[in-house]
Regions:
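Metal-dependent polysaccharide deacetylase catalytic core of the NodB/CE4 family, i.e.
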Residues: 1-75, 80-96, 118-130, 162, ...
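Catalytic grooves of carbohydrate-active enzymes
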Residues: 26-27, 98-162
């Protein structure tokens, strides 16, 4: 949590992803609330802003928890997919993020090229690095190359929370 607090202090958005990385489609509302609350309390203990964004563990959208997320003040929830997100058209609790990791080839570049002024590409870097979970690992050199490409393309990179809290 010390490292997470450092990232928060650097301006990184800290979202909720549950305590146990459970399949949210298969648990009760009470159990889901306990999963959310654990992370919220940890954030509070470490002086991290309360999470307002959520990432569905494992990727699939869990329709059964969207109401709870809204009640708790979350503004968006992200799954995994290969599409852009248009906040004027798309549901903020069914955002599809493009995973970027060592095993996804050119998907990063293809996804960035699809972005427009009104349809955003949501990029998901699960771990840089994430050696205990090699299936979602992104080596630091690849991450740096991706960041350089975004800069070269004059891409504007913003946290998810800013898409949904502008003007509030």
């Amino acid at each position: 949590w010390r490292q997470i607090a450092e990232l928060s202090g650097m301006g990184f958005e800290i979202g909720n992803h549950t305590k146990s990385h459970c399949d949210c489609r298969k648990i009760s509302g009470q159990d889901f609330l306990a999963e959310l609350t654990y992370i919220e309390e940890k954030c509070r203990e470490h002086a991290i802003a309360p999470p307002r964004t959520f990432a569905y563990p494992g990727g699939p959208v869990a329709e059964n928890v969207i109401g709870i997320l809204k009640e708790r003040g979350y503004v968006t929830a992200r799954s995994c997919g290969d599409t852009t997100f248009d906040p004027q058209r798309d549901d903020p609790f069914r955002v599809m993020g493009v995973p970027v990791q060592d095993n996804t080839g050119n998907k990063f570049f293809e996804a960035v090229q699809r972005a427009t002024d009104s349809a955003y590409t949501v990029l998901v870097f699960h771990g840089v690095p994430d050696l205990p979970h090699p299936w979602v690992n992104t080596e630091p050199a690849r991450f740096e190359a991706c960041m350089e490409y975004l800069a070269e393309q004059n891409c504007r990179v913003i946290p998810m929370r800013e898409i949904f809290t502008a003007g509030q």
